[in-house]
Amino acid sequence: MKNKKLIRYTSRDFDSIKADLIDHAKRYYPNSYNDFREGSFGSLMFDSVAYVGDVLSFYLDYQVNESFLETSIEYDNVRRHAKRYGYDFYGRPSAFGILTFYVLVPAAASGLGPDPDYLVRIKTGTKVSATTGATFMLTEDVDFSDPKNEVVVARVNETTGRPTFYAVRGTGQVKSGTLFRTNVNIGSFERFKRIRVGPSSINEIISVYDSEGHRYYQVDYLSQNTIFMEVTNKNSANDGVRSIIKPFVAARRFVIEQDSTGTYMVFGFGSDDEASLNINVADPSSAAIKLTGKNYITDRAFDPTKLLDTNKLGVAPQNTTLTIVYGANDADQINVPSNAINSVKELVYEFPDDSRISSALVRSVINSIEVTNDKRVVGNTATPSTDEIRIRSYGAYASQNRTVTREDYESYVYLMPPKFGSIKRASVINDPSSSNRRLSLYVASVDNSGNLVLANDTLKQNTKTWLNANKMLNDSIDIYDPYIINIGFTFYVSVDSSYDKQSVLNNCFSSLSTMFAEKMYIGEPLYISKIYKELNKVDGVIDAQNVVFNVKNTANYASSPISLQELVSNDGTYLNTPKNAILELKFPNLDIRGVAK
């Protein structure tokens, strides 16, 4: 032990490592080497070793930081940590809206009303396109024979005055994107098989079948072997319920993983024996607690999604071909303004009875179909930043798949699957005038430019349906639009005489634009001191003297009944945003003005 050399393991940076190397050489090799000049060969060797040590130390520190959600920088790593906390998202969310369809239908022989044989039904899957190039797909049938449709006379016989054609108006819901089909060849058995489906823009897996016709089901995690399937209710005419939800054991299942490189499916490692249990409906008794050799009961939480007694985590496909149908947006700009959807791209239709109609009149009816959107189609939002993912993941971890607190509801809104659309900002408040636990949920979306807009009715309904799955039975939710208050301001700064005033102003504009790039939250106040602090950090600014706000209510801005006097606090230090409103600096280049003195 007396010959053991002293090594300092705490040296991590370039200078300390080099100093330790020189000290080591002087201490243990005083007669072998004593040239420590900067330009010597020994100095080169010391610098090289210290350089490598510094790089390795940095790499070690970086990787350690990437192991924690709080300190991660890389987007994919933050995303993986968030998934472990229960917050997961994938794909670009779909945009939803209501379209209006028009069709010219020949008049009946009597001239009173349209001929019912030519009242076409536009089927689910029909594709329409917008001026932005985005494709939208019909999610429900548009039946022009519905008596609720508006019918007006479109053409008349000039001689007799009798109607010859009627215009019929119908509506239907659409979602952005289209369906894609891909085939993936699967080789021999592999535990936890992972296959690439497609790009990271996929927002929904529609169906997965193998060559033998077996269907695979998507689950949240592989140990979850029970899904709930929609079954048509044959008694819907009497009880008003269109479908019945029934539990179903999914022996063949998979989970989705997604990062910047693509979308992947991961399977378990079970064999076909697991799928041959012939269990069509899950039986909770198979998951009953088993007591062996003890006279007490341990408190165990019952998981209703795990009703099959197996630990193989699902059947893994082998020596087959998987046919996968998935949905994805085919354009970047899918939030479109009103009247932007104007053409039918791919029509799927049917008539009541093909044997009773004329092919010429059929072509006339089909060619007359027109489409438009009376209201904007929204639902897509920008990919959340790393900071947003961190905040939302903490909320998802605390909510534990149930909605009890205010934060639970807000977190669960952000967890809504992308196939239902996406909410940019959400806020829940208790209704003080309610005695039956009513909650008010305020939601806002964004347009193609990233500016705040009101969510349409379809997106609100999707949000309510999503929340109903996990809310408390006696909670009632009302979804409202918040007031969008567009603000602007003028700042006054003193500039050092040695600096160019215009350059300093440009730097101030750039700094403030970056500050307001991230949209504020509903009910979030704006502290004016933050603007002063940002201005004072700009080189050349001696002091930020004043900031004067104004509310924008002109064209291209949101209309809000809230005045500036209602926003400014009594001491004038912040803008006190109402709980049902959200502040937005919509056009930084126009809404920020500066004066240099």
Model-derived regions: residue spans:
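Signature of Asx- and small-polar-rich beta-strand/turn repeats characteristic
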Residues: 1-597
